[in-house]
């Protein structure tokens, strides 16, 4: 089925070639902000990495407690919890030292507490929970969760995650290189790098401002974003290639503009329907899936932008065959 215009006086929904400098400015600014986020995160003494690593990668012990409250839970502060740790008589003196740098976070309107510290033994974790209960009040039956990951296992998981990301992106690069010519492949890979970089940059800033951490779920989100981005880009490339073969009256810039206009509605509809369940996860998916859904939603938006704006705008630099 041909989608080429019957005449050359076609009105483009979005004229990429005319607005390409604006597209480059927007993407360039987003990439610059992302690199700044990496820099400030790396130089931050409390982080020391481009992204704030989560419990999965750093190891340690994570304790989640749910308080028993009739309606609203009374407000307590991290100072109250720290004082409880200082006043507690732990059987092991090293426990107090481990809790000195513990991260304390309140969830669900002070109904739940999250404590993250260097690795604790089961007996130490039990004593920590008892000391918190003295300040926070009674806890829900079964509302206690204790997880421990050794630093060696955490480092191994981080290494495995990075390798899996590298392998996945390499496979995508090979697929694109086989499917399209060299120039198309280069721009598609650039778009993939652009999408992943910006999502990571946003989470870098979130780690600095809001102490948001990245974990293994974030790596899954990046892999999903890569696949989604490539799929959208391939659709636009296929339309450009089809028009390039069938329409000889148009120059290459016109072909790119028409291909973008022809796929714009499809891309927006696909992105919109993909965002709907992600929005539901953001509001109703709980704390575990919250940032995972945020990362995916951001990736869908950025991926759509690169597919219908950034890559086609770069293709307009290509000379006529």
Curated annotation (Swiss-Prot):
Keywords: Cell inner membrane, Cell membrane, Membrane, Protein transport, Translocation, Transmembrane, Transmembrane helix, Transport. One of its GO terms (molecular function) is protein-transporting ATPase activity. The chain crosses the membrane at residues 23-43, 158-178, 189-209, 217-237, 258-280, 290-312. It is a multi-pass membrane protein. One of its GO terms (cellular component) is plasma membrane. One of its GO terms (biological process) is protein transport by the Sec complex. The keyword Cell membrane applies. The keyword Glycoprotein does not apply. SUPFAM superfamilies: Multidrug efflux transporter AcrB transmembrane domain. It is found in: Cell inner membrane. HAMAP family: SecF_B. Belongs to the SecD/SecF family. SecF subfamily. Forms a complex with SecD. Part of the essential Sec protein translocation apparatus which comprises SecA, SecYEG and auxiliary proteins SecDF. Other proteins may also be involved. Part of the Sec protein translocase complex. Interacts with the SecYEG preprotein conducting channel. SecDF uses the proton motive force (PMF) to complete protein translocation after the ATP-dependent function of SecA. This is Protein translocase subunit SecF. It comes from Prochlorococcus marinus (strain SARG / CCMP1375 / SS120).
């Amino acid at each position: 089925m041909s989608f080429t215009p019957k005449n050359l006086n076609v009105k483009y929904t979005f004229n990429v070639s005319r607005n390409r400098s604006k597209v480059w400015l927007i993407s360039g600014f987003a990439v610059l902000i992302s690199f700044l986020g990496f820099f400030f995160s790396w130089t931050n003494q409390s982080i020391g990495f481009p992204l704030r690593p989560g419990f999965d990668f750093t190891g340690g012990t994570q304790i989640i407690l749910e308080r028993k409250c009739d309606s609203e839970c009374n407000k307590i502060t991290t100072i109250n919890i720290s004082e409880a740790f200082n006043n507690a008589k732990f059987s092991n003196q090293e426990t107090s030292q481990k809790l000195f740098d513990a991260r304390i976070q309140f969830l669900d309107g002070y109904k739940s507490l999250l404590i993250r510290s260097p690795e604790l033994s089961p007996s130490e974790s039990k004593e920590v929970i008892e000391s918190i209960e003295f300040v926070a009040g009674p806890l829900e039956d079964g509302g206690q969760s204790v997880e421990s990951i050794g630093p060696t296992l955490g480092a191994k998981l981080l290494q495995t995650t990075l390798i899996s990301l590298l392998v996945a992106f390499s496979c995508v690069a090979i697929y694109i290189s086989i499917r399209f010519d060299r120039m198309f492949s280069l721009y598609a890979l650039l778009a993939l790098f652009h999408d992943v970089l910006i999502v990571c940059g946003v989470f870098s800033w979130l780690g600095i401002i809001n102490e948001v951490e990245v974990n293994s779920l974030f790596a899954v989100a990046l892999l999903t974003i890569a696949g989604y981005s490539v799929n959208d880009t391939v659709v636009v490339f296929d339309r450009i290639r089809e028009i390039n073969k069938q329409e000889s009256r148009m120059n290459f810039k016109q072909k790119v503009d028409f291909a973008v206009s022809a796929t714009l509605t499809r891309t927006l509809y696909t992105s919109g329907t993909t965002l709907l369940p992600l929005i539901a996860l953001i509001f109703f998916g709980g704390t575990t899936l919250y940032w995972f859904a945020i990362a995916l939603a951001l990736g869908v938006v950025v991926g759509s932008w690169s597919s219908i704006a950034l890559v086609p705008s770069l293709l307009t630099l290509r000379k006529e065959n």
